[in-house]
């Protein structure tokens, strides 16, 4: 009788602990597991875009002939430098290796704009900023809505309002640049 009660207690104990051990194993693999590829790709793409924004912002602050374009460039340099620093920490925490230099696609955009000057630079730079920020808003919104990693999703959500503000500012600056060209 004693042996049966002990065996029964052991079986009940195992039955109670088994679901908890599966839950613990699942949660530890979520924390320590590999970041989903889509989230890692988002981080890498955001880092490249952010570095490009900083580089182009420096060029605009230096080369722009229009004061609004100059100011926009300075703002891009400041805001994207801050976001890049946050993203570097997030990437490090998630085990994502970021390149310290621009890839060919982003470097090509920088090189093309760096060759321009005056009103041509102003126009092409601000056009590029409108296009880039439209694209950024879509990508960040997608990550904020559908990202698999909670920390990456949170960072995208936190950064999104600033990108939307940049887009509005780029669009209003673009209108001003086009209007000044007509006069």
Predicted regions and their residues:
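His/Met- and acidic-residue-enriched segments that coordinate or traffic transition-metal cofactors
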Residues: 2-13, 17-183
């Amino acid at each position: 009788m004693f042996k049966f009660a002990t065996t029964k207690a052991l079986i009940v104990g195992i039955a109670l602990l088994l679901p908890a051990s599966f839950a613990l194993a699942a949660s530890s693999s979520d924390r320590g597991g590999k970041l989903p590829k889509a989230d890692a790709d988002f981080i890498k793409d955001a880092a490249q875009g952010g570095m490009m924004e900083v580089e182009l912002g420096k060029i605009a602050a230096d080369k722009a002939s229009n004061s609004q374009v100059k100011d926009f460039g300075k703002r891009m340099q400041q805001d994207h430098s801050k976001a890049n620093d946050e993203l570097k920490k997030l990437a490090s925490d998630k085990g994502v290796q970021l390149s310290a230099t621009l890839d060919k696609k982003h470097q090509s955009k920088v090189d093309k704009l760096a060759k321009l000057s005056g009103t041509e630079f102003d126009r092409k730079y601000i056009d590029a900023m409108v296009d880039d920020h439209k694209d950024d808003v879509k990508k960040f919104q997608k990550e904020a809505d559908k990202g698999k990693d909670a920390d990456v999703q949170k960072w995208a959500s936190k950064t999104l309002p600033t990108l939307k503000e940049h887009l509005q500012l780029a669009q209003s600056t673009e209108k001003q640049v086009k209007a000044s060209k007509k006069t």
